[in-house]
Amino acid sequence: MSNLTEERWVAADLRAPLTPAGRTVVDLLAGVIPRISAEAADRDRTGTFPVEAFEQFAKLGLMGATVPAELGGLGLTRLYDVATALMRLAEADASTALAWHVQLSRGLTLTYEWQHGTPPVRAMAERLLRAMAEGEAAVCGALKDAPGVVTELHSDGAGGWLLSGRKVLVSMAPIATHFFVHAQRRDDDGSVFLAVPVVHRDAPGLTVLDNWDGLGMRASGTLEVVFDRCPVRADELLERGPVGARRDAVLAGQTVSSITMLGIYAGIAQAARDIAVGFCAGRGGEPRAGARALVAGLDTRLYALRTTVGAALTNADAASVDLSGDPDERGRRMMTPFQYAKMTVNELAPAVVDDCLSLVGGLAYTAGHPLSRLYRDVRAGGFMQPYSYVDAVDYLSGQALGLDRDNDYMSVRALRSRTSA
């Protein structure tokens, strides 16, 4: 892992990666982006997942970009550089970037488990990381339960587990080989715990439903997955503690898992800006004052967006390697700037794309125009956890006002599901 103090930092505006591993990943992407960009419109129209692009990612080692070099990966550890790579890809196609983010995120979090987990967890993490580096494993996260469903683990009576439930919004699902499923389990005394079983795609009782018809991110393969008494080995279960424990230490892992996604929405906004400004410049003559005001506003907001995201990523990178001190404080120190940046992105990125439509005019108000796709894709950012807008308001206001609350959105969801059951 690189030493943060030994590098000369440049303006954190996501213009370029900062580490050799980051530059390697961006250079590899450059060879596949033209085809991804050329196919983006058709895949958006038909809602088809770019299987061929991910096959190419596997051949190039990009499915193991965030796997440690010692395990055969490209060794990309810097969150800033991961976000920069995602931004580049999202400028071509946000759906592909969203799906790839799922794999990159698992590489980052599994690396932590490999370095700091119990012996069985370290062994499981190493197996998966090596398979990811070899292009043989695509690992999804399955977090959100279908409405009215609680995904649960029950003992199989022989030391293992049986998983039943239904998850929605599972991106990259068409090619997934493994699913990290956020579930609940109940002890004999009735206490409820959070756990994450790792379920193989070929597990009995697992069904991937081809039913995605989203407003945006239409080629991201964001499907539903059904689990009907799927067997789970004891050594493929990650324990996440009791529901309602109020452990802010978990916010660190949630930040690492999700903060790089901000690069996707920065990429969408950048792509929209480039289309609109290119259109304006290509019309001939000097643009009218109103158009020039829009252009100046676009670039101003984009710079504010990129630098805010860059600052939050820089903070997260520094905190992620510092395991000294109070774990709960570390979690808040990572999550709070992340949420400042996410709130900023969720406000500015859609506004940038909206002004781009105004700049281009009625020509952009067609389903086939690239700004139409970007307009729909950018709205996905507001629904991503952690946190959605309402949850982010609760978290940030709670931090400012010193409120005593559970900041783990997975724990809060579990409590709500038990209350409504």
From Swiss-Prot:
Pfam families found in the cross-reference section: Acyl-CoA_dh_1 (PF00441), Acyl-CoA_dh_M (PF02770), Acyl-CoA_dh_N (PF02771)
Listed pathway(s): Antibiotic biosynthesis
UniProtKB keywords: Antibiotic biosynthesis, FAD, Flavoprotein, Monooxygenase, Oxidoreductase
EC number: 1.14.13.187
SUPFAM superfamilies (alphabetical): Acyl-CoA dehydrogenase C-terminal domain-like (SSF47203), Acyl-CoA dehydrogenase NM domain-like (SSF56645)
UniProt function note: Nitrososynthase involved in the biosynthesis of everninomicin, a broad spectrum orthosomycin antibiotic. Catalyzes the double-oxidation of TDP-L-evernosamine to TDP-L-evernitrosose. The enzyme first oxidizes the substrate to a transient hydroxylamino intermediate, which is then further oxidized to nitroso sugar. The nitroso group is probably spontaneously oxidized giving TDP-L-evernitrose. In vitro, catalyzes the double-oxidation of TDP-L-epi-vancosamine to TDP-L-epi-vancosonitrose.
Keyword Flavoprotein: yes
Extra remark: The nitrososynthase activity was originally established using as the substrate TDP-L-epi-vancosamine, which is a biosynthetic precursor to the expected substrate, TDP-L-evernosamine. The true substrate is presumably TDP-L-evernosamine, which differs from TDP-L-epi-vancosamine by 4-O-methylation.
Lineage, uppermost ranks: Bacteria, Bacillati, Actinomycetota, Actinomycetes, Micromonosporales
Family: Belongs to the acyl-CoA dehydrogenase family.
GO molecular function: acyl-CoA dehydrogenase activity; flavin adenine dinucleotide binding; monooxygenase activity
Protein name in the entry: L-evernosamine nitrososynthase
Complex formation: Homotetramer.
Keyword Flavoprotein: yes
Reactions listed under catalytic activity: dTDP-beta-L-evernosamine + 2 NADPH + 2 O2 + H(+) = dTDP-2,3,6-trideoxy-3-C-methyl-4-O-methyl-3-nitroso-beta-L-arabino-hexopyranose + 2 NADP(+) + 3 H2O; dTDP-beta-L-evernosamine + NADPH + O2 = dTDP-N-hydroxy-beta-L-evernosamine + NADP(+) + H2O; dTDP-N-hydroxy-beta-L-evernosamine + NADPH + O2 + H(+) = dTDP-2,3,6-trideoxy-3-C-methyl-4-O-methyl-3-nitroso-beta-L-arabino-hexopyranose + NADP(+) + 2 H2O
InterPro entries given in the database record: Acyl-CoA_Oxase/DH_mid-dom, Acyl-CoA_Oxase/DH_mid-dom_sf, AcylCo_DH-like_C, AcylCo_DH/oxidase_C, AcylCoA_DH/ox_N, AcylCoA_DH/ox_N_sf, AcylCoA_DH/oxidase_NM_dom_sf
Any GO BP annotation: antibiotic biosynthetic process
